C-alpha cells in the first residue's frame, strides 16, 4: 500500500513535537536528515545555507519531496539506504569545515512500540542496525569533536540509554497512534551552550511561545518609537553585551 505524506507513520506532526526538536538545534551550515519520512521537521525549520540532505528508502515519499523542493538549489533528496551515504556526507562536509547537524528519526525499537504489530514501516531497522547507527554517531564524534552535532528521536530504551549515556536527554509528552507517549530526544551537545539555528520556537509549549512573541512585539513597538540615535545606542549596547 502506498503511504501518503500526510499519514506516514512516525511523522512529527503532533502538537509541538517538531517545534520542540527544532528549538534544540544549534546553528549549522549543513542539515542532514536520514529516515526523513515526510520531512515535517525539515519543512518547519529554517533552511541550512549550504545543503539540506533528506534521505529515505520510501520511493513514494522521495518523489513527493523531490517535487516539493525542486526549486531549491540547496536541497539534496535521495532514495537510498542511509547507512551507505550518511557517513560520506558527514565526512565530506565536516572535512570542509562546515558545521553539520544530523537529525535522525529512525523506526523506533519494536520493544518500545505498543502498536508494533498493527503499525509497521515499509523499512524497519533490526536491533543490529540500531546498534550500528548509534556506534556510527559515537565514532564520528570522536573523529570530529568540533562542528558535528547529532540529535536522535526515539522512545526510552535500555539500548539507547546505555549507548548514549553521556549524551543530553530530554522528554516531551505527545499523542501517538497507541495513545499518549513520552517522546525522547538525545543530543550529542548541550543545547543551552550554543547559539540556536533559529529562535522561532523558543518556549516549551505553544502558550509559552505566544507569550514570548507578544513580549517581543511590545519591545519592538517601543523601540520603533525612539529616535534614530536612541535606537543606535541600544543597538550598539546589545551588540557589546551579546558579543555579536
Task: Outline where the language-model segments fall.
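Class I S-adenosyl-L-methionine-dependent methyltransferase catalytic core
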Residues: 1-244
